[in-house]
Amino acid sequence: MDAAVVSELLRALIRRDGDAVAAMVTDDFAFEPLSTEAAARGVYRGGEGMRTYLRDVGETWRQFDLTVSAVEEVAGHVLVNGRVYARSRATSLVADDPVAFAWRVADGGVAWGKVFTSEAAAREAVQRRDGGV
């Protein structure tokens, strides 16, 4: 079940366990996080890319908490809804916002993930990737 794989990945991300995250993604994995006013982010690739992402998060945010409220399989993807609470290391910026993820699992590993500011945007992206279903 793809949702179980993604749920395990999210638990590892919440723990900031780079080795566990790297072990769960495919070699050609691509992760597209959101850029914020605290930091611009590009695409992170593969297991080493996710280790770098977690280091970048730690360098940017004094506190970074992800809460997951729902995980659902949709059109060959896994949608996740939740909330991010983060406090910048460099400024007084506090982010307390809803967040949604779209993930794709292939061959038992997570092959793609992208972060969105809303569930609607994540659903729309999944439908576009799936050919409009």
Question: For the regions a protein language model found, what residue spans apply to each?
Answer:
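Short, low-complexity N-terminal intrinsically disordered segments enriched in polar/charged residues
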Residues: 1-27, 124-133
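A beta-strand edge to alpha-helix "cap/lid" segment located at domain peripheries
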Residues: 1, 55-133
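A solvent-exposed, acidic/Ser-Thr-rich amphipathic alpha-helical stretch
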Residues: 19-20, 26-75
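Residue-level detector of alpha-helix boundaries and kinks
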Residues: 5-6, 35-38, 88
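Generic anion/oxyanion-binding catalytic loop in active/binding sites
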Residues: 10, 39, 111
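Short beta-turn/strand-loop junction motif enriched in small, turn-promoting residues
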Residues: 18, 32, 85-89
